[in-house]
Amino acid sequence: MAAAESDLVIGPDYAPAPETRVAAGVPVGAVTAFTLYSGDSKFYPGIARIENAITRRRDPYGNRIAAAAHEQSMPLPYTRTVWVYVPRQYERGSAAPFLVAQDGYGYMKVLPRVLDNLVAQKRIPALVAVFVDSGGGDAQGSERGLEYDTVSGRYSDFIEAEVLPRVVAETGVTLTSDPNGRATMGASSGAAAAFTMAWFHPERYGKVLSYSGTFVNQQSPPDPATPRGAWEYHDHLIAQAAKKPIRIWMAVGEKDLHFDDPEETWHNWPLANARMAAALKAKGYDYRYVLAKGAGHVDPRVTEATLPGALEWLWRGYR
């Protein structure tokens, strides 16, 4: 793919894509919901950040400073909701391609509508979508931070072992095992989690969709193997590893989080995402990088303007 097709600049004016609106006569997919309990999880029994002098520490630019797990977190049970969208066109017994969305509730308003329209227009296959909420909180010391910002295969293992079997049991769908038919997406730390799912298990996921990805130093608790968390991806992990069969679409706002912070903070979102794109390009990945002029962090204007096209781009050529 030519560089001109891979690196795009959009904005600063945005309008919702027509596929984000309800269209007359379009079949509407069914949505089922169920609850997961931390007490049943082998992967995530539940934590929450302790609010104390240690967790209130910040660097000169306002970024949290990570600490050891026992200093910043305490056990706390949680419940999480999972929603499953099944398109009307799904044929029972067939192995369905699917998409896992992190911070699932945040996509429940727009994504099913987009899928209804794109599937009806045959621009994407009849996707099942799995919307998974986090275990709660945000950033260092929290359950969400542990799940999404950790640079390991743990979260992917959790989805594979504890979420997808329940999806099958609750809905009766059959899910494909073909990584080309399995996508994962998210925004902010949820986007970092999506990439991490594919990076550590490309045999499971071959497609990633990222908005304002947290490819920065936010891993908590710290891991000596990746001391700067997801910043390590574009610093050296992508360059040093054999190319993996992953296709990624990613967008970041020009005025995203900490856009004017210096590099040495390892916490500048636009810089981190630009570096991700450069690392992917250098390694020959199939990627698309979108810089959204005038946009902020996980800017809803950008999501509504680009989501249909992003999904179509990710799923092009799938049979």
Task: Report the location of each language-model feature.
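Non-catalytic cap/lid and distal C-terminal segments of serine-dependent acyl enzymes
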Residues: 1-319
